[in-house]
């Protein structure tokens, strides 16, 4: 794999289950593949459970295990034109309503790109993926508007183009407003150079932004910039966001800025990663201005392409106060095992 693809794969820290999916049917024009993962996750939060604090996280081990199942289909319509469909469901180990349909879309594609409709990715996720490379933690300053993230009622385009050995990826999507009038859009571009440097930028807007208990109805606006560099077994990346009227901790934040830094080192079958995440309310002061502030480290060992184990620890730098609960300021330790198929 060349350097530009390593950068896009973020140092192999997250192997997609689609990449290991098994083809269960194929003929001269069509194919069908099934994939997914089984992932056991034990989370220990560094909080005294006996304290009478609202939304306190338990100091006992919490089971966050999950299963994902996906089905992908593709058929050739003409020599240069094809149709695709994809579905993915996630099931939680908890007896709750947390099961989620992650993807459900179909569309068409050619050498000029792919256009799909349904529940599909928005356009800013490929930028937050620059730093969202950990097995469990991270991505705390990469919160996105729903229209820029994975969402339904979504018409999405992605195109990837080779430019003399470099690669340009362009994404754009439009989310149609329903009864909640939350229509929006996002667009982004990413350029990956064969020498290991990658960078990108994007922008998104969405109507109907409001806090959980408020009556606000504002237009959220969000801009991202990202950069990465891969050299030998090392990967470095950074992300910056500037936002207006976005929801954080169920509160509508008028103006916020944030950034993330990530570094990864691959040693044989092991990958070691550290990230720093910071997000602040630009109009607040003192401790109340800090919405996210943490350092995380993890290590993952890949036994083969299908099975891995990992350990991850988050050092939460927030202090519990009137605007931050003890749970939101808690450290976390996670042990996990994952089987991809």
Swiss-Prot record:
Keywords: Cell outer membrane, Ion transport, Membrane, Porin, Signal, Transmembrane, Transmembrane beta strand, Transport
Cellular component, GO annotation: cell outer membrane; pore complex
GO MF, one annotated term: porin activity
Major location category of this protein: membrane
SUPFAM superfamilies linked to this entry: Porins
InterPro entries: Gram-neg_bact_OMP, Gram_neg_porin_domain, Porin_dom_sf
Pfam family, one: Porin_4
Induction or repression: In response to elevated hydrostatic pressure.
Membrane topology: Multi-pass membrane protein
GO biological process: one example: monoatomic ion transport
Binding partners and assembly: Homotrimer.
Recorded family membership: Belongs to the Gram-negative porin family.
Function: Forms pores that allow passive diffusion of small molecules across the outer membrane.
Protein name (Swiss-Prot/TrEMBL): Porin-like protein L
Record organism: Photobacterium profundum (strain SS9)
């Amino acid at each position: 794999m060349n350097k530009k693809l390593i950068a896009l794969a973020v140092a192999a820290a997250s192997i997609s289950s689609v990449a290991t999916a098994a083809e269960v049917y194929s003929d001269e024009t069509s194919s069908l593949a099934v994939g997914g993962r089984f992932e056991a996750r034990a989370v220990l939060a560094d909080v005294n459970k006996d304290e009478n604090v609202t939304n306190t996280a338990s100091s006992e081990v919490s089971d966050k295990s999950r299963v994902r199942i996906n089905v992908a289909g593709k058929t050739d319509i003409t020599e240069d034109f094809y149709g695709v469909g994809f579905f993915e469901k996630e099931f939680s180990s908890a007896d709750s309503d947390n099961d989620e349909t992650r993807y459900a879309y179909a569309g068409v594609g050619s050498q000029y790109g792919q256009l799909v409709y349904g529940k599909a990715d928005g356009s800013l996720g490929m930028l937050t993926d620059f730093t969202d490379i950990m097995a469990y933690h991270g991505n705390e300053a990469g919160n996105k508007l729903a229209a820029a993230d994975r969402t339904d009622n979504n018409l999405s385009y992605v195109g990837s183009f080779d430019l003399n050995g470099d690669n340009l990826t362009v994404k754009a999507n439009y989310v149609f407003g329903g009864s909640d009038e939350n229509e929006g859009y996002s667009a982004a571009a990413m350029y990956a150079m064969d020498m290991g440097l990658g960078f990108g930028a994007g922008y998104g807007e969405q109507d109907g932004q409001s806090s959980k208990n408020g009556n606000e109805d504002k237009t959220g606006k969000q801009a991202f910039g990202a950069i990465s560099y891969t050299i030998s077994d090392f990967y470095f990346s950074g992300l910056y966001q500037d936002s207006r009227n976005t929801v954080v901790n169920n509160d509508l934040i008028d103006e916020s800025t944030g950034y993330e830094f990530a570094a990864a080192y691959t040693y044989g079958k092991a990958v070691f990663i550290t990230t720093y995440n910071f997000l602040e309310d630009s109009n607040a002061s003192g401790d109340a201005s800090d919405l996210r502030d943490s350092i995380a480290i993890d290590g993952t060992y890949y036994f083969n392409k299908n099975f891995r184990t990992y350990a991850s620890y988050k050092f939460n730098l927030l202090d519990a106060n009137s605007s931050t609960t003890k749970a939101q300021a808690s450290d976390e330790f996670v042990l996990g095992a994952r089987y991809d198929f």
